[in-house]
Amino acid sequence: MATHKLLLLPGDGIGTEVMAEVSRLIDWLNKAGIASFETEHGLVGGAAYDADKVAITDATMALAQASDAVIFGAVGGPKWDAVPYDARPEAGLLRLRKDLALFANLRPAVCYPALAEASSLKPEVVEGLDIMIVRELTGGVYFGEPKTITDLGNGQKRAIDTQVYDTYEIERIGRVAFDLARKRRNKVTSMEKRNVMKTGVLWNEVITQVHAREYKDVQLEHQLADSGGMNLVKWPKQFDVIVTDNLFGDMLSDIAAMLTGSLGMLPSASLGAVDDTTGKRKAMYEPVHGSAPDIAGKGLANPVAMLASFGMALRYSLDMGELADKLDEAIAVVLARGLRTADIKSEGSTVVSTSQMGEAIVQEMQALHG
């Protein structure tokens, strides 16, 4: 049995609480002989700043480079609002993405049958929802230069952010989306703003070319990003895989998240390119939710997104798809049984703490393994 090296980065706020439930699951998998994991732990975000005055140390980055997968919690909080910009907690996350060359962000939006009532939309609109949003992660306006604020000297300031995309960046994210669609329902929707942005014109052109050359068997459609956001709310089940740039992907994935009822339910994966020699890729897995400092330490956090993120690591980095399927099933069974953390509680449900939810999911995994 191969041993997989994992780096666990809990981060700040509820990150430590939800990561504890991943550790619980890993410990059980190791003890049961189902899998073999070797784990390292590191600081990131505000926790790293408090210890080392940086958002992530070079030593922790070296551990990330050497791991088969990075499992990331959440960073940030009001405590660090006044720290230098380059050392802000979010800078640790951005460095991980950039140094590991994690260009593809996968955000599934899945509505479990037991939670259709938790959505703000009608149950029939979201029941059975299963969307994958593929967001380009290392280009666009978040990384483009120049990025400045200039004092104009007349009591005014000017801020500049730069949206930049090259052909190869669009090609590789397009291929990720098309490859995923082939394993799902064979449809890709590309979203941009070609009506007002030159990067949108290029994005549309390149995605169309990649489709024509390599993926004619996959259905492709284009939507403007603002219209696409409207359609996500109006008729979300029309979508299978959505591919879009960094900025729009950030927004659209949060819209999709709330279709499911809670940010606490949604995982994500950030993937690098496949190494031609090893066949492996750098990858990081994290919940979509933030550090939620207002509920940190109270046992209220929902660990499902964190556990589901670990499930994505099993599927996309560790070649353990069957185990990932069982984890998905365990989560669904526990929810169907009526267990809920506070963020997804409903009439007649049993409200449980972070650790109780994590323990219930691990117990269900045990039952599924006989």
Curated annotation (Swiss-Prot):
Reported cofactor(s): Mg(2+); Mn(2+)
SMART domains linked to this entry: Iso_dh
Residues binding Mg(2+), per UniProt: 226, 250, 254
GO CC terms: cytosol
PROSITE patterns membership: IDH_IMDH
Subcellular location, record wording: Cytoplasm
Residues where NAD(+) binds: 77-90, 290-302
Pathway note: Amino-acid biosynthesis; L-leucine biosynthesis; L-leucine from 3-methyl-2-oxobutanoate: step 3/4
Keywords attached to this entry: Amino-acid biosynthesis, Branched-chain amino acid biosynthesis, Cytoplasm, Leucine biosynthesis, Magnesium, Manganese, Metal-binding, NAD, Oxidoreductase
Pfam entry (one): Iso_dh
Record note on cofactor: Binds 1 Mg(2+) or Mn(2+) ion per subunit.
Catalysed reaction, written as an equation: (2R,3S)-3-isopropylmalate + NAD(+) = 4-methyl-2-oxopentanoate + CO2 + NADH
Gene3D superfamilies: Isopropylmalate Dehydrogenase
EC number: 1.1.1.85
Protein origin, superkingdom: Bacteria
Predominant location category: cytoplasm
GO biological process: L-leucine biosynthetic process
Quaternary structure, from the entry: Homodimer.
Functional note: Catalyzes the oxidation of 3-carboxy-2-hydroxy-4-methylpentanoate (3-isopropylmalate) to 3-carboxy-4-methyl-2-oxopentanoate. The product decarboxylates to 4-methyl-2 oxopentanoate.
Name assigned to this protein: 3-isopropylmalate dehydrogenase
Gene, per the UniProt record: leuB
